[in-house]
């Protein structure tokens, strides 16, 4: 049997009045919109005043796992296994944010990606960030982060054997409310694993080889010819290169270009499966192209300037390289963060000083 709405609310308020001081009564009274049966209106606790009225920078959800499918014209869709972090700012006048709206927006945008309305993974986060501003009318700032993995089909260099590689993808968007249209900055990045060969140890081994060959009375020109064809041994590292580019929402950066730049900036690419000819090719290529961790970062920066000439000067570039040492217990690391304009100025300065 249904209990009459007014009698229940009045009864509860009478009980509360006996325990709550008079000056606090108006804020704590139960609103008349309370309904007992499910599916009817209930008080919106998130919209009430908090006990401590302090603004919060980020409120939201983390580690929302989703399967992201992005349609491509005349190609198979790209599938990403993704983790989302979604945040809004919260004014001190509200007790909490309505977190269920975050899930609703993510699902809506993911469906748009499947339908082909969101055609690029680079734009996914910016669309979510914009929609969050619409749903959270109290928020002035929204932020969306997406960390994903997807499989890239590859072919080995000699035997042309098919194999796959896992690439980590990072995307982020921040939307800020203005009196007109929201201002959105977005970023897209990737982390790729490759191989590096140490130039220092290789130079030491080269000097030793020259001494041994000279002691065997090998002619100097033959020694030089041999060392030119067969690079000396050195120790190797498994390198992890990271490149992220932050741009305005109306700009576009191809994820495929970022991945290619990272691969080409280490001593050699690596493959899950290698036949003997492939293995020889990869090892030889790496030792003919020795690089320090610092070299990798500088090479990435140079390639970014060559590949993305159309980007505005305030585009922010973040480059990181971690090399896992084979003969040491530590890892080598280098990093650079700069705008396109700053990198362009530095490279031009180097070229004019000579």
Where are these regions (language model features)?
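Acidic, Ala/Val/Gly-enriched low-complexity intrinsically disordered segments
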Residues: 8-10
């Amino acid at each position: 049997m249904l209990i009459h709405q007014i009698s229940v609310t009045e009864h509860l308020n009478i009980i509360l009045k006996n325990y709550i001081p008079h000056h606090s009564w108006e804020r704590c009274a139960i609103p008349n919109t309370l309904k007992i049966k499910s599916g009817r209106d209930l008080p919106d606790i998130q919209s009430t005043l908090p006990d401590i009225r302090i603004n919060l920078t980020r409120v939201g959800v983390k580690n929302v796992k989703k399967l992201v499918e992005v349609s491509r014209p005349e190609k198979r869709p790209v599938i990403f296994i993704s983790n989302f972090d979604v945040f809004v700012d919260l004014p001190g006048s509200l007790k909490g944010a309505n977190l269920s709206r975050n899930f609703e927006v993510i699902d809506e945008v993911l469906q748009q990606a499947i339908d082909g309305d969101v055609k690029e993974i680079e734009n996914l986060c910016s669309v979510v960030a914009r929609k969050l501003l619409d749903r959270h009318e109290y928020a002035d700032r929204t932020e969306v982060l997406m960390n994903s993995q997807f499989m890239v089909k590859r072919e080995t260099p000699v035997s042309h054997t098919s194999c796959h590689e896992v690439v980590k993808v990072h995307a982020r968007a921040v939307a800020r409310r203005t009196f007109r249209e929201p201002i959105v900055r977005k970023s897209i990045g990737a982390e790729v694993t490759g191989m590096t060969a140490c130039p220092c140890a290789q130079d030491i081994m080269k000097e030793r080889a020259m001494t041994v060959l000279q002691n065997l009375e090998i002619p100097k020109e033959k020694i030089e010819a041999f060392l030119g064809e067969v690079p000396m041994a050195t120790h190797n590292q498994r390198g992890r290169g990271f490149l992220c580019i932050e741009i305005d929402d109306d700009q576009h950066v191809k994820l495929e270009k970022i991945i290619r730049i990272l691969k080409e900036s280490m001593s050699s690419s690596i493959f899950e499966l290698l036949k003997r000819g492939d293995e020889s090719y990869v090892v030889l290529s790496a030792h003919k192209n020795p690089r320090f961790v610092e070299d990798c970062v500088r090479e990435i920066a140079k390639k970014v300037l060559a590949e993305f000439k159309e980007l505005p000067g305030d585009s922010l570039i973040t480059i990181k390289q971690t090399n896992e040492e084979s003969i040491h217990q530590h890892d080598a690391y280098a990093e650079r963060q700069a705008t396109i304009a700053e990198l362009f100025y530095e490279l031009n300065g180097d070229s004019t000083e000579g």
